[in-house]
Design a protein with these regions (language model features):
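Short beta-strand segments enriched in small/hydrophobic residues
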Residues: 3-26, 175-184
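Cap/lid and interdomain-hinge subdomains that line or gate substrate/regulatory clefts
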Residues: 45, 104, 109-244
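Short, well-structured alpha-helical segments in soluble
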Residues: 60-73, 90-92, 260-269
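Periplasmic-binding protein-like
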Residues: 73-83, 101-103, 272-277
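Long, internal scaffold/assembly segments composed of regular secondary structure
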Residues: 231-232, 236-324
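C-terminal catalytic subdomain
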Residues: 300-425
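Extended hydrophobic packing segments that form well-structured cores
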Residues: 376-499
C-alpha cells in the first residue's frame, strides 16, 4: 500500500519594499540559491520549492492560503532575509493551517570586514528580522519548529530533513482511518480511549465492523490466489515443521494467506490504513490473524492487538513518517512481556502472541505453527525472528480522561544472551534509558501502556514535535531522566495541558 504522497515544502522569504528593487532582487537570488543547494544536498527527504519574496500583508496572506489548499504542500519554511515588519504576517499566520518551520540563518557566512557598509547591513539582517518574526509567532501562540545555523551546514540541513518527517506525520494524521473488527479486551483499561476526542485532536477516524463481515471477505479469496501466496511464503521464509506433518502444516499456513488477502482487500475497499483485532472475538475466522497481520504491517498498515486502536493509529503514523527512508530498520507494535533483572544484563523482552512486524527482524525469518491457548481456534501460523540491535523509541499514547499524553522512551535494543527455542514468537529485547529501574518507574508514573508503537527510525525529538503540533503533552524518558524531575514535569503537564 502507499505510505504517503510526494510532498513538497514551500520556502518563503520575508522582506519589505523599504530597501529598494536592487536589494529585493538580491534577496530573491539568495533565496533561490539556498533552495537549490538544499535540494542538492541529499539531506532532505522532500523537495523544497522557492516562492516569491513576501513583502506585503496580502501577498503573505494569499501565499499561506495557497499552501493550505495545495495537497502537495506539507509545510512552509520561513526565513527573514532582511527586516520584515511582523504585523504584516498576522493575517497570514492566523489563517495558516499546516506545519511551520522558522529557519534562522543568514546568506553570508562571514562579515566582510573590509567592504561592509549600510547597504550590506540592511540587506543581511536576519539577526534582526527573524527576531521580529519570532516574537509575533510566539505572541500568537503558534506551534512551530525553529532551526538555527548556517544554511549550508550539514547538521542544519539534517534538522530540516528530520522536521520534514514530523510535518508529514502532522499532515497525514488526519488521513488515518482505523478499522476495528473487535472491541477492547474485556476489563482492560489502558487500551480504552475517547475516539471522538482522538478525531478532534489527531483527525483519526476509528470505525467498528462486525468481525464476520471481514471474515466473508476472507472466505471469498480463491484457492488459486491463496496457493500463490503460500508459494511466496515458502520461497521467502524458513519453514520450521518441528515434527508436524508437512501437508497439515501447509494447510495452517494457507489459512493465514487467505486472511492476509481477505483483510487487505477489505481494507482497500473500505479505505482503511490500520486495523485492530482481538483473540476473544474471532467470529468465523479459523485462526487468530498472525502471519497475515505481520505481513500487512510490513506493507505499511497499522495494527493494534486486543482492540488497541491508539497503537494501530500510531504504528500507521510512524510507517508514514519513515516511508522512503534509506536504510530504515523498521517499525512495529510491541508489548512489554517479561524482565531480565540480572544486574548488568537488565532488560525487557518484547513480544506478542503473534503480531510483530518483520520489518524489525534481524537474520532469518521462519514460519511456525504452534498452539495458542487463547482464542479457541486452530494453531495459527506466525513469523518468528529476533530483532535488530540499536537505539529506538517506544511510544505510548494514553487517554488520561481529560486529555491525551504521549510517552516517548528512548531504548537500547540488544541481543539476548541465549536462544529461546521453546518460545514460538518474534521478539525484541531492550533496556529502556536511562536504565531499567528508572525507566520502568518513570513509565509507570506517567501512565504508560503495556503496548507500544516502536521504531528504530524516528527520534524522540521528532515524535515530541509531533505531539506538540497536535496540542498534546509529550513526556520524554531518556538518559537525562531522573524521577525527581519527571514528577515535576508531570505536575507541570497537568497544569498546562488539562482542559
Amino acid at each position: 500500500m502507499k505510505t504517503g504522497k510526494n510532498y513538497k515544502f514551500w520556502f518563503c522569504t520575508g522582506s519589505q519594499d523599504l530597501y529598494g528593487d536592487e536589494c529585493l532582487q538580491k534577496v530573491a537570488e539568495h533565496s533561490k540559491i539556498i533552495v537549490e543547494k538544499l535540494n542538492e544536498s541529499g539531506n532532505l527527504p522532500f523537495e523544497v520549492v522557492w516562492k516569491p519574496t513576501l513583502i506585503t500583508n496580502e501577498l503573505i496572506r494569499r501565499t499561506f492560503n495557497e499552501a493550505n489548499i495545495d495537497d502537495e504542500c506539507a509545510g512552509v519554511i520561513v526565513w527573514m532575509h532582511t527586516f520584515s515588519p511582523a504585523k504584516s504576517w498576522i493575517l497570514g499566520l492566523q489563517e495558516y493551517r499546516k506545519p511551520l518551520l522558522h529557519l534562522h540563518t543568514q546568506f553570508n557566512m562571514e562579515i566582510p570586514y573590509d567592504t561592509i557598509d549600510m547597504d550590506f547591513m540592511n540587506e543581511n539582517q536576519s539577526a534582526h528580522g527573524d527576531r521580529e518574526f519570532g516574537h509575533m509567532v510566539t505572541r500568537m501562540g503558534i506551534e512551530r519548529k525553529v532551526v538555527v545555523g548556517p544554511w549550508s551546514d550539514e547538521k542544519l540541513q539534517k534538522k530540516i530533513g528530520s522536521w520534514m518527517r514530523t510535518a508529514i506525520g502532522v499532515v497525514e494524521s488526519s488521513h488515518i482511518r482505523v478499522m476495528r473488527v473487535a472491541d477492547n479486551m474485556r476489563n482492560v483499561a489502558v487500551t480504552e480511549g475517547d475516539k471522538v476526542e482522538a478525531q478532534l485532536k489527531f483527525g483519526w477516524e476509528i470505525d467498528a465492523y462486525p468481525v464476520n463481515e471481514i471474515a466473508e471477505s476472507v472466505a471469498a479469496v480463491s484457492e488459486s490466489d491463496t496457493n500463490a501466496l503460500v508459494e511466496e511464503y515458502y520461497s521467502k521464509y524458513n519453514i520450521l515443521l518441528e515434527g508436524r506433518d508437512p501437508a497439515e502444516f501447509r494447510k495452517h499456513v494457507a489459512v493465514q494467506a487467505q486472511i492476509e488477502l481477505g483483510f487487505e482487500r477489505f481494507l482497500e475497499e473500505k479505505n482503511y490504513q490500520a486495523i485492530v483485532t482481538h483473540f476473544g472475538d474471532l467470529g468465523a475466522l479459523k485462526q487468530l490473524p498472525g502471519l497475515a497481520i505481520q505481513r500487512l504491517m510490513e506493507k505499511g498498515y497499522g495494527f493494534g492487538a486486543e482492540g488497541d486502536w491508539k497503537v494501530a493509529a500510531m504504528v500507521r503514523l510512524m510507517k508514514i513518517m519513515t516511508s522512503g527512508m534509506k536504510d530504515a530498520k523498521g517499525t512495529s507494535m510491541l508489548e512489554d512481556y517479561t524482565y531480565n533483572l540480572v544486574p548488568g544484563k537488565e532488560g525487557i523482552l518484547e513480544a506478542h502472541m503473534l503480531e510483530i512486524c518483520p520489518s524489525i527482524a534481524d537474520g532469518p525469518i521462519s514460519i511456525k505453527c504452534q498452539p495458542l491457548s487463547m482464542g479457541d481456534r486452530e494453531d495459527p501460523a506466525r513469523l518468528v525472528f529476533t530483532s535488530k540491535e540499536g537505539t529506538g523509541i517506544a511510544t505510548s499514547l494514553v487517554d488520561l480522561g481529560d486529555r491525551f499524553r504521549l510517552l516517548i522512551n528512548t531504548v537500547d535494543c540488544k541481543k539476548v544472551e541465549k536462544p529461546m527455542p521453546k518460545l514460538p514468537v518474534a521478539t525484541n529485547f531492550w533496556t529502556p534509558q536511562p536504565d531499567l529501574i528508572t525507566g520502568a518507574e518513570a513509565w509507570i508514573l506517567a501512565g504508560g501502556a503495556h503496548h507500544t508503537a516502536f521504531t528504530y527510525d524516528l527520534t524522540a525529538e521528532q515524535m515530541g514535535d509531533w505531539a506538540e503540533a497536535m496540542g498534546i503533552e509529550p513526556v520524554y524518558i531518556d538518559n537525562e531522566t531522573t524521577i525527581r524531575n519527571l514528577k515535576k514535569d508531570l505536575m507541570l503537564g497537568n497544569l498546562v495541558y488539562r482542559k
